[in-house]
Amino acid sequence: MDNKHKIVQILADGNFHSGEVIGEQLGISRAAVSGHIKTLSNIGLDIYSITGKGYQLAGGLTLLNLKSIRQHSNLTNELELFPIIPSTNEYLMSLIKSKNGLVDGHTILAECQTKGRGRRGKTWQSPYGSHVYLSQYRTMDSGLSAASGLSIAIGLAVANTINQFTKLQCQLKWPNDVLVDGKKIAGILVEAEGQTDGVCHLVIGVGININMPESSADYIEQPWTDLNNISDELIDRNVFIAKLLQQLDEVYQEYQLHRLDNLYEQWNDNNAFANLTVELSSVTKKQVGKCLGIDTNGALLLEDISTKVVSKVFGGEVSLRKKLKEN
């Protein structure tokens, strides 16, 4: 554990701590403490400095704790926790490529990502100690093609978990965003390595907004919300992650056995754009049509406005077509 994370542990109680005392505890100079505080502030922690009193982490912080997570879950997955990491997905993908001998279900958690990313290379804001950043390793024997609908299933697991902590119902935006009241609260990134018809290795990345700091909110270019904003009480991330791991395991086992056969109707019941006119943007073209939901393969069903012909779409970005009137 590096000194930056040790400083966070000291400040997590929300009280003032002098730079001198922190330095003595860690065996470093006050100048070094000041440098670490600056770095921590730059990655999203609201740390105040008052002459004569020291440093204070506004509101305190409940840090992730693997023992606590395991106490609230009956799963035996291998769990790793990093205070700071470039990307949990990148880390697992690097282990896959180095043939590290990962065990199915191996899960990486982090307090902060310095290079967090979503689909299509978009940046995922990952401030320290604020949200859930999780990546899980899985294997499938039936090839890459069989994993094409997995992000749909994972979206359901995430939505089901969030629904346990709030009275508001989550909606699902194809292919892998979770919304509450039309605002994004979670995203999923599934990456794969392997053979078309043989064994494939999967990394399931999940990012969930729990308590967004103001300093990070300014960098988000779309409507968003977080769990503390829509819940009646503050969320313990350790309890939340334990419930999430259980949901991920249940949904993954169901997907392994039956793909989306028993899941797609539940997804359609929570489709954020059900029967609305949407615009689908892909690398090659744009389409406008009515969103009819998904089929058993996870393909988006898009009805042409003029011809009423329904096409199946397997890739792209969906957004509401607000300027067009619904039929």
Summary of predicted features, one role per range:
Residues 2-155, 163:
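N-terminal lobe of the biotin/lipoate ligase/transferase fold
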Residues 50, 75, 127, 173, ...:
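Short, solvent-exposed coil/turn segments
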Residues 177:
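Conserved active-site carboxylates
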Residues 83, 172-174:
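Short loop/edge segments at beta-strand edges and connector loops
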Residues 103, 127-131, 173, 183, ...:
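Short connector loops at helix/strand junctions that flank enzyme active sites
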Residues 1-29, 35-38, 42, 143-146, ...:
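Long, positively charged amphipathic alpha-helical accessory segments at protein N-termini or as interdomain linkers
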